Amino acid sequence: MKANTMFIILCLTLSTLCVSSQFTSVLGKIFVTNRAVKSSSYEKYPFDLSKEDGAQPYFMTPRLRFYPIGKRAAGGMEQSEGQNPETKSHSWRERSVLTPSLLSLGESLESGISKRISINQD
């Protein structure tokens, strides 16, 4: 009797929460249903920090950027990325300059191992 009463109270509580709540549970995570991804006035931050709709800070949504596929396929994307200071660090040309090659990583690993062996032998 007591278990049935508790089960009924639990079901009623959950149903009222689901109806009155603004949140939706998707794969165990909570998302705000009435909050859309929009550009913020803080262009240098990767997250939408504006609280115009009263969203809490822990529900901040990352901004999404969409680029035309044809422009990217034609090769015009790199030129526009180089001019935009926000996407300049994400340019593939700059990444290729800053990223060490596998050959140089292998050489530095070999030299580090040989130095460690020579230190251990002394």
From Swiss-Prot:
Pfam families from the UniProt entry: ELH (PF02323)
InterPro entries: ELH
Pro-sequence residue ranges: 22-34, 73-122
Signal sequence segment: 1-21
Keywords: Amidation, Cleavage on pair of basic residues, Neuropeptide, Secreted, Signal
Modified residues (Isoleucine amide): I69
Coiled-coil zones: none
Compartment annotation: Secreted
Broad class of where this protein is predominantly found: secreted
GO CC annotations, alphabetized: extracellular region
Residue segments, region Disordered: 74-95
GO biological process: neuropeptide signaling pathway
GO molecular function: hormone activity
Stated role: The atrial gland peptide A and peptide B precursors are the source of the 2 peptides that, upon release from this reproductive system gland, initiate the egg-laying process by exciting the bag cell neurons. These neurons, clustered in neural connectives near the abdominal ganglion, in turn release other peptides that act directly on the ganglion and also, via the circulating hemolymph, on many other organs to control the physiological processes of egg-laying. One of these other peptides is the egg-laying hormone.
Family statement drawn from the similarity comment of this UniProt entry: Belongs to the molluscan ELH family.
Record-given protein name: Atrial gland peptide B
